[in-house]
Amino acid sequence: MIKVPEKIPKKKRIILGPLSRFLLKIFKWDITGEIPNLSKMVLIGAPHSAMRDGWYGLLAVLALDLKVTFYGASWIFTRLPSLITFSKNLDKLGIPWPLGWLQKIILIRLGGVPVYRVNSRGTIKAAIEKFSRMDNYLLLIAPEAGTELVPKFRSGFYYLAKELNIPYVPVEIDFKNRAFNIRSPENVTSSFEEESKKIISIFEGVEGATRVFTMSE
């Protein structure tokens, strides 16, 4: 297990921390690389090809006692994953169940922020306004914005990093080696398209849960 630098936002969890470290060991998952010793950054994870990415990702966050804010599709906060799509509404995927209200409370307390994909206008602007007033934060985003294969990244991570003047840190979700590989931090120095090409070259060939990462602009 890697060490967490002193500037990183942390939240000590007496039960969930040790339990998550135990579960990662049982599942034979590891966390490699180094977290930059910075008080503000955006972690971007890929390839995001299955809902179990989120499960292992949550275990990693809890195992390291990180205090994070993560953005996820609104339906994952109240519904259960399903292999069959019952609705064309992107905010109503999955299967509703009686404890959806409790699921939402738990995920929000862990740092989750629901993103309504049908009407997501203003989400990034609101986030920029919120975090510009904070001294430390750790943001988590899946730039593919879903588990399906997409032709390009969503631009949210780019504008967060650019407007907040913070680095973004690529994290490989590597199912072949059962590891979250933390790469070197990157600063926004060019257009969204150019930054995307840079990140694509980092993630290219990484084996996710159901597919190998590939993307052609």
What are these regions (language model features)?
Residues M1-D30, T214-S216:
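N-terminal membrane-anchoring alpha-helices
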Residues I26-G205, E217:
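Soluble catalytic domains of membrane acyltransferases
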Residues G208-V212:
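Mature, function-bearing regions of proteins
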